[in-house]
Amino acid sequence: MSIGILGTKLGMTQIFDESGKAVPVTVIQAGPCPITQIKTVATDGYNAIQIGFLEVREKQLSKPELGHLSKAGAPPLRHLLEYRVPSTDGLELGQALTADRFEAGQKVDVQGHTIGRGFTGYQKRHGFARGPMSHGSKNHRLPGSTGAGTTPGRVYPGKRMAGRSGNDKTTIRGLTVVRVDADRNLLLVKGSVPGKPGALLNITPATVVGQQA
């Protein structure tokens, strides 16, 4: 796995390219993310690094969490994430990963949680067609048939019905980095990314599905 970075979604806006065309972009606060732990084959059986993100007050973390972070000389951090790496050479505890790891024109994968919708109905959750809305119809937003009768005498598992939707982990692949603001640790990525403003994101260099990173 390639080493990525954690960030938060700030929102969407648009910028203009050299030809004057408007480009929709998402602004991401990417890092800084200090390395909080380095794992090696000798000590843990595999090579990996753990990074932290989003500084918080000490009272918001437990004593074991604070002790773990203090070993790396890191401040109290809300989120921790691990990346597998082929080698840990050149990586040090406390080393900060910042937005300048990426460059304009680079392809990235962005992982996050979609906006939660709560308990939703058939149309909103699955895109079912509604019934007639005219006078006399009693089937405006009903689901229709949920199966046969006595045989099988039950609703099959997996039947699309009303229920909780959203707040699912998803990855948007192959997004283009339009601009990098290294001074403010901002990434401008073309298109939309999962979640609402303030949502936690995992940004990694793009990989082809099935390709060994």
From Swiss-Prot:
GO molecular function terms listed in the Swiss-Prot or TrEMBL record: rRNA binding; structural constituent of ribosome
Gene Ontology cellular component list: cytosolic large ribosomal subunit
Coiled coil: none
Keyword Hydrolase set for record: no
Keywords: Ribonucleoprotein, Ribosomal protein, RNA-binding, rRNA-binding
Keyword Hydrolase carried by entry: no
Function comment: One of the primary rRNA binding proteins, it binds directly near the 3'-end of the 23S rRNA, where it nucleates assembly of the 50S subunit.
Family the entry assigns: Belongs to the universal ribosomal protein uL3 family.
Record text on subunit structure and interactions: Part of the 50S ribosomal subunit. Forms a cluster with proteins L14 and L19.
Matches recorded under NCBIfam families: L3_bact (TIGR03625)
Protein name: Large ribosomal subunit protein uL3
Species name: Synechococcus elongatus (strain ATCC 33912 / PCC 7942 / FACHB-805) (Anacystis nidulans R2)
Top-level taxonomy: Bacteria, Bacillati, Cyanobacteriota, Cyanophyceae, Synechococcales
